[in-house]
């Protein structure tokens, strides 16, 4: 039998914004604000983030996302989930966070902070930090 080891993690610093600039594609301004607001709310700095679970739908907004991430987090690893799961619309936050936790359990990561963000239709955007370890 396989031994189940504890993998403590928590979601904190949940931040939401509404992007009024474009209801179907997110703007650079809104994404930048979402990510920086999340860091501010959690009192974390850019260098405290070990990885970022990107939205990455395979569409027009991917280039914009990469531009903002390169500007704010030039040396932080990105984790892309949607190519493996598809676009799950309203369930993406729960499913992609579960997928990320499963991924991290299979790596040598025992602790750290991982930024997750989701860009929804109608400009509803949310971000949070997944804290792994105690």
Walk through the language-model features, giving the residues of each.
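Active-site-proximal alpha-helical scaffold in enzymes
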Residues: 1-6, 88-110, 128-130
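Condensing-enzyme catalytic core mediating Claisen C-C bond formation in acyl metabolism
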Residues: 1-51, 122, 131-134
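Short alpha-helical patches at coil-to-helix transitions and adjacent helical residues
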Residues: 28, 32, 66, 90-97
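Active-site-proximal gating segment of KS-fold condensing enzymes and close homologs
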Residues: 60-75
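Short glycine/serine/threonine-rich phosphate/pyrophosphate-binding segments
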Residues: 125
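Cysteine-centered functional microenvironments
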Residues: 12-24, 48-58, 76-93, 111-121
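Terminal domain-initiation and capping elements
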Residues: 71-77, 105-109, 134
């Amino acid at each position: 039998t396989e031994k189940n080891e504890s993998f403590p993690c928590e979601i904190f610093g949940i931040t939401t914004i509404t992007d009024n600039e474009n209801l179907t594609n997110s703007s650079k301004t809104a994404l930048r604000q979402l990510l920086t607001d999340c860091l501010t709310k959690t009192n974390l700095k850019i260098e405290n983030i070990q990885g970022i679970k990107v939205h990455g739908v395979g569409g027009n907004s991917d280039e914009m996302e990469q531009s903002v991430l390169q500007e704010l987090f030039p040396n932080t690893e990105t984790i892309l989930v949607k190519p493996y799961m598809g676009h799950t619309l309203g369930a993406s936050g729960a499913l992609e966070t579960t997928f990320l936790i499963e991924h991290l359990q299979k790596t040598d990561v025992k602790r750290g902070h991982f930024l997750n963000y989701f860009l929804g239709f109608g400009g509803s955007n949310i971000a949070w930090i997944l804290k792994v370890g105690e």
